[in-house]
Amino acid sequence: MREVAEDIEEIRRRKLLELQRKYLEQQKAQEEEARQQALIEAQIQAILRKILTPEARERLARVRLVRPELARQVELILVQLYQAGQITERIDDAKLKKILAQIEARTRREFRIKW
C-alpha cells in the first residue's frame, strides 16, 4: 500500500515538473515573440519618422485613434514603398491626405438594403 502511495506521489511530482517546464517554455516563447514585435514596430516607426513630416505623423496618429486598422494599413504601405525605393521625398500632410483618401476609397464597402 505504501509503495502505491509513493508511486502515485512520484507520478504527481513528475507531472507537476512537466507542467512547470511547459509553462516556462511557453512564457519564454511569448516573451521572444513580444520582443520581436517590439523590434519590428520600432523599425516601422523609424522609417515613418524618416519619410513623414511632423504634421503628417501627427495626422497619422490622429487617424490611428479613430481607425487603427486604416492607420496600420497606411503605415505598412508607406514602409513597403520606402523599402522599394519609390519614396524619394518626405511625405507632407497634403500628400498623406491623398494617400488616406485613396486607400479609404479602395477599401470602402457600400451596403444596400433592398426592400
Curated annotation (Swiss-Prot):
Q: Which domain of life is it from?
A: Archaea
Family per similarity comment: Belongs to the PDCD5 family.
The species is Pyrococcus abyssi (strain GE5 / Orsay)
The yes or no answer to whether the keyword Transit peptide is present is: no
Identify the keywords attached in UniProt to this record, alphabetized: DNA-binding
Its protein name is DNA-binding protein PYRAB09250
Q: What is the lineage of its organism?
A: Archaea, Methanobacteriati, Methanobacteriota, Thermococci, Thermococcales
**A GO molecular function held by the record:** DNA binding
List cellular component terms (GO).
cytosol
Q: Which InterPro entries match?
A: DNA_bind_arc, PDCD5-like, PDCD5-like_sf
Which SUPFAM superfamilies does this one have?
Double-stranded DNA-binding domain
The answer to whether UniProt assigns keyword Manganese to this entry is no
Listed Pfam families? dsDNA_bind
